Amino acid sequence: NATLIGSLLDAGLTPVFCAITHDGNGSLLNCNADSIASAVAKGLARLADTDLIFCFEQPGVMRDINDPASVIASITRESYGALRAEGVVTDGMIPKIENALEAVDSGVRSVTIRRSEGILIPGGTRISH
């Protein structure tokens, strides 16, 4: 409900979303937090310019996981396919980038994958068309 979320933001409130959901039958489910953030951003993008930042423990998507200086500055859908084929993007980074691409395709102005430290300083990996 993007309108409700927008109303909360307009009132100066910061909604917090949890990746734990339920199936309606009493069982708890651990959902992908990036999927939830992407869904919220896609909804908000219908109301206003929206930027999404996925924060995790690395400085961005790295060509070499052991070299923090190997951050890939920008990934497009085309380059993502090549990075997967090369084995650079694997495991948990796959759904993170796919959620980012879906968000951009749905009108989110920008998506960045990065560390939370220094979040106001440009950096990380920008996902674009």
Feature locations, PLM:
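C-terminal catalytic "cap/lid" subdomain
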Residues: 1-129
